[in-house]
Amino acid sequence: VRITAKKVGLRTDASSKFEKGLDPNLALEAVNRAVQLVELLEAGEVVPGVVDEYPNKREPWQLSYNPAWINKFLGTSISEEEMQKIFEKIELKVDPVNHIVTIPTFRPDLEAQADLAEEIARFYGYNKIEATLASGTPTVGKRTYAQSITALVKDTVIANGLCEAMTYSFESPKVFDKLLIPADSDLRKAIVISNPLGEDFSIMRTVSFNGILTSLATNYNRRNESAGLFEVAKVYIPKALPLTELPHEIPTLTMGMYGNMDFYDLKGIVEHLMHVLGMSKVAEYVTEKALPWMHPGRTASVIVNGESIGYLGEVHPAVLKNYGIGTRAYLAVLDMEKVIANANRDVVYQALPKFPALTRDIAMLVKEDVTVKEIADIIKKNGGAYLEEAKLFDVYQGAQIEAGYKSVAYSITFRSAEKTLADADIADAMDKILKGLAEELGAQLRDK
């Protein structure tokens, strides 16, 4: 009633009377009064008993109040005794010890402590309440740690030349077939939307890269020679179906590219990201063959502190065909929850080296299935105390290289914090490195 009266701008006695609601318990009193008048005027015969269709009778209810809160809320200093008198004036029963009032059924508008405060102000007098300026303690607005890391990730990826994308969280069930996801995969157990716009938006996504691949396909079909996109968005993994609780929402960084960028460009971005987040020394890249939408021989898992936080590599040719992308494309997917958990933003400063480094380059023949990680691990294991860095600078297969083999070249840097190193200081370490490579990987040192 009050809302309607306000909308039409019409204030009447009826609106004032009925806007607070009517007490259904007054019906019996009205009937009794009518019967009394019938009997008084001898207009009929009164019979005993009442027929009442009233299954859910409204009973008085109780509200607790806090005098200190009411005074703070109103900006007053009214005593508890005065509050009690005001409550009694409006026919509320008061328990002053426990600060509880019993609300009669004819006051349905009193539902909360703020309503009681309004009644106090009405009887106390609005003109007695002194005007005061709002006061409070300002707080410094800032991002949470997770928000800061996410913002840093976005800035870093943008600085590496990728453009941020925003894709739909709703997808079609046909996406799973396009991505070659097996029929028994848990990724197919998606949340179904009860009122979808259509089949193409009928489930919540359980994988993050369909939107990126679709966007890459759009760019390719519009004859863009190259494209690099990324998105930080959530995937929705139900804990059980049908839903009994909220799903696990996993924020995920997805990067995709094609054209004048390849696997090594993508790996470079991931490595830069690991460096910025303080994880470069604990990040490893291990061959990954269990992802059906990725090329089995050109995909690597990103391992940090012994735990996989994502993967990167080339998209499976069959998937590219399903999306209408006629060239090689590359994806990197990182679990942002794990990235945030492993990020280390503590900066450690150290003095610039006082003594020059000593560098040795080695080139070796190894079988083509030997990974550079295996080679790097052996170099680090046998490099000794002076080893500073082992950097891959060349991988070659082709003319003058036997079939089934590849040439791998490393630049190995040694440095001491106490002196200038001589050849004799690193001779033992180099011998151990070469011996380890030969014995464990069958590596053959190349002279030229």
Protein language model regions, located:
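Flexible loop/turn segments at secondary-structure boundaries
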Residues: 1, 108-109, 137-139, 172-178, ...
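Residues forming anionic-ligand binding surfaces in small-molecule and nucleic-acid pockets
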Residues: 1-18, 56, 61-64, 124-138, ...
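Mobile "lid/hinge" segments at catalytic clefts and subdomain interfaces of large enzymes
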Residues: 1-58, 200, 218-223, 228
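Non-catalytic beta-strand/loop surface segments
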Residues: 6-17, 84-87, 91-93, 286-294
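A generic structural motif
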Residues: 18-26, 71, 105-109, 197-201, ...
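Flexible, glycine/charged-enriched surface loops at secondary-structure junctions
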Residues: 38-53, 95-97, 164-168, 222-229, ...
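Extended, well-folded interaction surfaces typified by the phenylalanyl-tRNA synthetase beta subunit core
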Residues: 63-225, 360, 413-415, 425-448
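A carboxyl-terminal module marker
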Residues: 89-92, 239-243, 248-249, 254, ...
